UniProtKB/Swiss-Prot annotation:
Pfam families for this protein: Na_H_antiport_1 (PF06965)
Function according to Swiss-Prot or TrEMBL: Na(+)/H(+) antiporter that extrudes sodium in exchange for external protons.
Cell inner membrane found in the keyword field: yes
Protein name listed in UniProt: Na(+)/H(+) antiporter NhaA 1
One of the GO biological process terms: regulation of pH
Subcellular location(s) per record: Cell inner membrane
Protein's UniProt keywords contain Phosphoprotein: no
Coiled coil region boundaries: none
Gene that this polypeptide is encoded by: nhaA1
Any one GO molecular-function label of the UniProt entry: sodium:proton antiporter activity
Gene3D superfamilies: Na+/H+ antiporter like domain (1.20.1530.10)
Catalytic activity: Na(+)(in) + 2 H(+)(out) = Na(+)(out) + 2 H(+)(in)
């Protein structure tokens, strides 16, 4: 995700910062730096998962599990919708996560690594290998009807955790490898969305499904006629979410569909904006009087407002929304999801039997072995047959490290587990145990491999 931190305006000597503001900034600035680090989202998500595990295995476990199922509803006359807090998080908050996933997918397909076929081949092929092989690995250990439905669980890669780990390595990994991992995870997310839509839907209510199709067409129509107000898309998207909730298709898919219809064209082109800004700045300088407050100068206030409107217009709605939602999703929605879903009560006296369950073994086998073999093997074959080439400054050893990090399947894997084993809490627990164990092992292994590799001088393509 492109989330470069905007530069701040620094007061100059003629307009110094007040003393109290300087002191406040000494406290705030380090916090802002922490929030804007690539590693922070992954660290907070990890902390949330550990908190959930600690609560589920503490004397507070009963209260924690009870809180997950507290009912919360909304009444409007005779109309009522009520769900547990757990369901509101998984069906409601996660729709915003899928909205951001959709924005990222659209941007990558328009101007990112997936926009050019030659560049896109490697992450696409790697992602497909990293989805198909893990599913086969899981199926091989779960051939009975009860557990077979979990085949989609090990297909997912958690981009927040993976990037958090790779960011800890700083300059030890080439930038092209990070780009490859991001593109792979985005294709992986698209695959997970398709799997959820096709294979993890309940009995379909066709009247609501038709209504959803009509609302989707309406969103596309809004895009085609040039409506740029995000509020219009959010309003229709909210109705689409409710319709999907009633249709049997998972409601979070409304987030992806809405994101794909968000306009990706700016109101003004960059040349028009540049010329207009020069004109506004000229008028602003001309209208400035020393030490005059802008509150008293309506002309200057008007120019600033015009400039602000221009800044909004030269950006695409897609850019603005992706930037606006990145931090709420990374620092609130995903940690809340982890707290509500990662809490697994472990009977340590019976640990061997817990981890010896076919679901747990299937998830571990799929994530740790299937992802590694799928991503590495598919990448090697694609390069070997001349379909693509390695990213700049990378070798197959780097791809091996990326495939280890690709085995971290936390968020989306848990989400699919909840869908695969609805009303079967024991099976969900088994799946979560496998996900947590695999993610821990994959994260540590990937870090150690790439850390060691960063200390060596690898030759590009030496392992081909």
């Amino acid at each position: 995700m492109s989330n470069e931190t905007p530069k701040k305006f620094i007061p100059n000597e003629q307009n110094p910062m007040p003393r109290w503001e300087k002191k406040f900034n000494k406290i705030l600035t380090p916090f802002e730096r922490f929030v804007n680090r690539t590693t922070t989202g992954g660290l907070i998500l990890m902390m949330a998962a550990l908190i959930a595990l600690a609560l589920a295995n503490s004397p507070l476990a009963h209260h924690y599990l009870h809180a997950l199922h507290v009912p919360l509803g909304l009444n409007l006359g005779d109309w009522r919708i009520e769900k547990s807090l757990h369901h509101w998080v998984n069906d409601g908050l996660m729709a915003l996560f899928f909205f951001v996933v959709g924005l990222e997918l659209k941007r990558e397909m328009l101007v990112g690594e997936l926009a050019e076929i030659r560049k896109a081949v490697l992450p696409i092929v790697a992602a497909i290998g990293g989805m198909v092989i893990p599913a086969i690995c899981y199926m091989s250990l779960n051939l009975n009807d009860e557990t077979f439905r979990g085949w989609g669980i090990p297909m997912a890669t958690d981009i927040a955790f993976a990037l958090g780990v790779i960011a800890l390595l700083a300059s030890r990994v080439p930038k092209a490898l990070i780009t490859f991992l991001v593109a792979l995870a985005i294709v992986d997310d698209l695959g997970a969305v398709v799997v959820i839509a096709v294979f993890y839907t309940q009995d379909l209510a066709w009247s609501f499904l038709i209504a959803g199709a009509l609302l989707t067409c309406l969103l596309i129509f809004f895009n085609m006629i040039g409506i740029r107000k995000p509020s219009v898309y959010f309003f229709v998207g909210l109705i689409l979410w409710f319709v999907f909730l009633k249709s049997g298709v998972h409601a979070t898919l409304a987030g992806v569909i809405t994101a794909f219809t968000i306009p990706a064209k700016p109101k003004f082109n960059t040349l028009t904006f540049s010329n207009r800004v020069q004109d506004i700045l000229y008028k602003f300088r001309k209208g400035c009087e020393e030490d005059e407050s802008i509150l008293r100068n309506e002309h200057l206030s008007g120019l600033v407002q015009t400039l602000e409107n221009g800044v909004v217009g030269v950006q695409t709605p897609l850019q603005r929304l992706e930037h606006s939602f990145h931090k709420p999703v990374a620092f609130f929605i995903l940690p809340v999801f982890a707290i509500f879903n990662a809490g697994v009560t472990i009977d340590f006296g019976n640990a061997f039997q817990l981890f010896n369950h076919p679901i747990t073994l299937g998830v571990v086998f799929g994530l740790l072995f299937g992802k590694f073999v799928g991503i590495t093997g598919a990448s090697w074959l694609a390069i070997r047959f001349g379909l693509c080439s390695l990213p700049n400054d990378t070798s197959m050893k780097h791809i091996i490290g990326a495939s280890m990090l690709g085995s971290i399947g936390f968020t989306m894997s848990i989400f699919i587990a909840e869908l695969a084993f609805v009303s079967q809490p024991e099976m969900i627990i088994q799946a979560k145990l496998g996900i947590l164990l695999s993610s821990l092992v994959a994260g540590v292994a990937g870090y150690l491999w790439l850390h060691k590799l960063g200390g060596e001088k690898s030759r590009i393509g030496s392992s081909l």
